[in-house]
Swiss-Prot record:
Known role: DNA-dependent RNA polymerase catalyzes the transcription of DNA into RNA using the four ribonucleoside triphosphates as substrates. Common core component of RNA polymerases I and III which synthesize ribosomal RNA precursors and small RNAs, such as 5S rRNA and tRNAs, respectively.
GO cellular component, one term: RNA polymerase III complex
Pfam families listed in its UniProt record: RNA_pol_L_2 (PF13656)
Protein origin, superkingdom: Eukaryota
Family per record: Belongs to the archaeal Rpo11/eukaryotic RPB11/RPC19 RNA polymerase subunit family.
HAMAP family linked to this entry: RNApol_arch_Rpo11
Gene name per UniProt: polr1d
GO molecular function, one term: DNA binding
GO biological process terms on file: cartilage development; cranial skeletal system development; embryonic viscerocranium morphogenesis; ribosome biogenesis; transcription by RNA polymerase III; transcription elongation by RNA polymerase I
Protein name, as recorded: DNA-directed RNA polymerases I and III subunit RPAC2
Subunit structure and binding partners: Component of the RNA polymerase I (Pol I) and RNA polymerase III (Pol III) complexes consisting of at least 13 and 17 subunits, respectively.
Lineage of producing organism: Eukaryota, Metazoa, Chordata, Craniata, Vertebrata
Organism: Danio rerio (Zebrafish)
Gene3D superfamilies: RNA polymerase, RBP11-like subunit (3.30.1360.10)
Amino acid sequence: MAELGQKHALEMVRTDGADEGCVTFVLNEEDHTLGNSLRYMIMKSQDVEFCGYSITHPSESKINFRIQTRDGVPASEPLRNGLNNLTDVCKHVLQTFEARMKEFKEQEESMT
């Protein structure tokens, strides 16, 4: 349990009467870097009807992330899949970068 005054990284906000397919998630301590990348990954899903985010105020590091799904799919499912897919993309980019850096350094060493 979070201590008094401490926020969770992710909060779920459902309006009264809304189903599980129409949810706003609040991502604390995040900005456009995660927001736009995650929105892109989530919108690739056929189950998603709408996905968007807003930053409530420039002085707050908080994103309101809205997901609406089709056919009764819970909004948490495309969020989870989007986060996993984005993690996979980041891992691939990091591995490719490290491999190319290793090749570059080996090439530099062989030239000296």
